[in-house]
Amino acid sequence: LAPCADIQDPAARLQACAAALSSRLYADGYTNTRVYTRQDPPAGLLEVVEGRIAEVRVEGPDGRLNRRLRNLLLPLQGTVLRLPELEARVARLERLSGVAGIQASLNRLGSDPTRAVLVITVDSGRRTLQGDLSLRNDGSTGSGQFRGLATLLQGDLVRSGDALLLYGEVNTDSQPNLGYSLASISYTLPLGDRLQISGAFGASRRNLIEFDRPDPDLSFRQLQVLGQADYTLGETLNSRWFGFAGLSVNRTDGYLGARAFPLLLGAGSDGWLRTGFLRFGLAAEGQGERISWSGSAYGLQGVAGLSTAEQLKILGFYGIEPGRSKALGLQLSGVWRPARRWQLTLQAAAQQALNPLTGAMGISLGSDNGLRGLPGQVISGDSGLLGETELSWSAWQHGQAEIQLVPFLGAGRVSTNLQEGTISG
């Protein structure tokens, strides 16, 4: 207000100060804040009426998406309108899953210029098919070091917000002989605004092609079924936290040549073992301008009723009671992008078994868990911890292709307590 301070006439000075303050507020983004002059007291005064967002409306063809976006924007209702902050929030909306495009407008509510209506028009275009194919050399020990992975993801397949994921993997040696194959399908379906359910089925076959002893014809077949429900406890434009609970059922068969053979701890004379467990916990995820993070705390509880009486007896001989198998775990990860070509990734995981666990409940170490430079799975145990950090630099980029240099450092340890003693590695 310095330019108007030297004006001698009180009325002219008041009007000039009001105009200067209005211009400054508008330049700072307070576009519907108004400055009024008052003649009482005689010296006059300036009255500033803050412009606010009085109402938020979201329009579009997808009712579920409209409700979600309105809930995310509802905290704006009643707040002071500042255009740069509002534009930043709208830009974050465009990054949300299911949003193909957004148009935002501000309208006056009635005749009051300080009360604005925010109108968001959403285009919920159907998500396109996404795929990924990669060739790597971090296969599984015994099943070949060369690894091929293929993934297909289709969102909005049956209804808005759902997702179908197809995954395939093969491992071979240099001959090439097929050592491992895996195929899985999973589907996620939203039920309402907060609840979603997921189901998955996977089948795999592992042949120990790299082992000559005790017998090169040892192989395993595994079937896995998973069902899980996620419930969103809270969500903002930058973060989401939710609870989850699921049931996993696993069946593994051991073979010597083409004949079933009891190769598994707990398997009977027919060579197969079925176990299952519940997994439940809390999780959170979020992102900012340069960072993203996620974390979860979970519990595991074995289910005895999924194994046969003979299998329970054999497992009990080794001190494993599926109905008493319990564990607690924690997973954390974070990504920081300090510059356009640089990215720092940190991740850690830990699990503590409260009682001896069945095999599928354990924690594994390998590149599948973030430990680069190792096979997909090297070793597993009931309890364990791991940590890994990597700093990636994009040395060359062209379109969708790029070459990265990724120095990394990682370590882990697992252990299993049985009646015979502790196994660790």
Give, region by region, the residue ranges found by the protein language model:
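Periplasmic polypeptide-binding modules associated with outer-membrane biogenesis and secretion
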Residues: A2-G139, G168-L182, L328, A348
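Outer-membrane beta-barrel domain signature
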Residues: A11, T79, N137-S143, T172-P176, ...
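Transmembrane beta-barrel architecture of outer-membrane proteins
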Residues: A20, A88, R147, Y180-L182, ...
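Outer-envelope beta-barrel architecture signal
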Residues: A100, A116, R127-G131, F146-G148, ...
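Transmembrane beta-barrel strands of outer-membrane/channel proteins
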Residues: L106, L133-N137, G148-A150, L164-V170, ...
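Residue-level signature of outer-membrane beta-barrel architecture
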Residues: S124, Q154-D156, L189, Y231-L233, ...
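Transmembrane beta-strand segments of outer-membrane beta-barrel domains in Gram-negative
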Residues: L195-L357, V414-S415
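C-terminal transmembrane beta-barrel domains of outer membrane proteins
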Residues: I314-G425
